[in-house]
Amino acid sequence: PPEVARLLEAAYKNRSPRQGLRDWALLAFLYGTGLRISEALSLTYADLTYQDGVPHAVRVLGKGNKERVVVLSPTAQRALFQWLKHRNLEGHPTSPYLWSHTAGRERGKPFPARTVQAMLKRVARRAGLKDWARLTPHKLRHSYASALMEAGRGIDEVKELLGHASIATTQIYVHVSRKRLEEAARALPEVF
């Protein structure tokens, strides 16, 4: 979606290249996985699976302590790969967390959700997004679900990726575009 692209571009164009990379990578990862913010920030290296030297999937402990495996989209793969490459170049301490501070007295500790929330609002404002003050990391989860549906994925697939117990919950997340609704209506065969 164009709003997500603008958000990611604004995140990357930070006065501090290090901070820009971090903000871009984390927001792209959240959008590219559909994870809840708590799920993403609690991920450790032990939760990560590689394929051909590239991050491939993450093991997530979701609501109700239900475990699921989320295969990374190309967007999430690129974002995580770039972030981990940066952390290794910076000589990051052996923090088990994928998304942790790389400097200062918080070095090695995972980012708090409120820090990510504040960063997202700053970036959204810089991107010129309307309603930037109401944007939350959870909205990226909604965008992920809607984008998958727009791409023709079934609601059962989206339900599993989001870790929902019920399709009714997934339906709340899915915002079908007018174009898709028109295509659906035209798909009905004519009878006369």
PLM features per residue range, with description:
Residues 1-192:
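Conserved catalytic core of the tyrosine transesterase superfamily
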